[in-house]
Amino acid sequence: MYDQRKQVAKVNMKIRIKWIGIGFVSLLIISLCFSLIHAQESTNQANLIGLQHQVPWFSFLLFLINASMVEEFLYREILWNLVRKLDIRVALTSVLFALAHHPGTILAWCLYVSLGMFLGMVRYKSDLWGSMCLHLVWNLLVYSLLLF
């Protein structure tokens, strides 16, 4: 099914930017709410901080950029196209996205599922590039906050 050629709809850049903005603000609000409820760092963040101290900052930054793009291609392109129904697409890719980030608590689990759902919403409303850009911007924000 995935190897068949399909027509890719062109997405207006304004629409893409609009949904990246909506997604970013939504992720920010959700993350702030979860942080107020439970201010403990996640297993994923602890692993990233440990890795950050082992490699030069530029290599780590490239790793984050690469991870954002590869994750979005896997979840919001390959797996996304294996399922036809939108609600199942979003649910499946969000749960798998959360599992890949090793949530250690129920709240961390909810946060990563929410992140996956918003990335899925942006993927649906714009395109893969929209979700890749949002994921990348989000990772860069988290990385810069980890530096301070």
Where do the protein language model's features map onto the residues?
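Transmembrane helix-loop-helix hairpins at the membrane interface
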Residues: 57-148
